[in-house]
A protein has these predicted regions:
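Conserved GNAT acetyl-CoA-binding A-motif
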Residues: 80-91
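Short amphipathic alpha-helix that is part of the acyltransferase structural core
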Residues: 1-24
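A conserved beta-strand-loop-helix scaffold within acyl/acetyltransferase catalytic domains
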Residues: 23-34, 40-52, 107-108
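Conserved acetyl-CoA-binding loop-helix of GNAT-fold acetyltransferases
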Residues: 63-80, 101
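Conserved active-site alpha-helix within GNAT-family acetyltransferase domains
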Residues: 92-109
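Conserved acetyl-CoA binding element of GNAT-fold acetyltransferases
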Residues: 49-63
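Conserved catalytic-core motifs of GNAT/GCN5-like acyltransferases
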Residues: 105-120
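Short, hydrophobic beta-strand segments that form beta-sheet elements in well-ordered domains
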Residues: 35-38, 87-89
């Protein structure tokens, strides 16, 4: 199993400085505004929102099939922790189809996020 730092480093790759991402995750956990769920080499960073809602961000160093298996376990843990609604954003609607095989159905709709529109997927419990 890889270290948390190695997972973030591999997931962030050349798109940014993995150290900055790691520091942000660590700081938000200490502030009690976020949680991290991990299974295998997949991390789900969860922002705690009002009304038992959460926004999730996924980092993985697993191969595709194993990443989906581990993501499914993380999602089960998030729901078991008492979150009633989970949000996550993607640049296009087809991005949510990868969740269907692991039994995680979502509703999606356009959402204005800052200066650009994205699709927001929502899972209600």
């Amino acid at each position: 199993m890889k270290s948390t730092q190695d997972i973030i480093k591999e997931a962030v790759g050349k798109r940014g400085k993995w150290q900055d991402v790691y520091k942000a995750i660590y700081a938000t956990i200490k502030l009690n505004t976020h949680r991290v769920f991990r299974h295998g080499n997949t991390l789900v960073w969860v922002k705690i929102l009002p009304d038992q809602a959460a926004q999730m961000f996924v980092f993985t160093a697993d191969k595709a099939g194993k990443a989906m298996e581990n993501l499914a376990e993380c999602l089960k843990a998030i729901l078991a922790a008492g979150f009633k609604q989970i949000y996550f954003d993607a640049p296009y609607e087809d991005a949510f189809e990868f969740l269907e095989p692991i039994g995680f159905q979502v509703d999606s709709a356009p959402y204005q996020n800052g200066y650009r529109g994205v699709i927001r997927g929502t899972r209600e419990v």
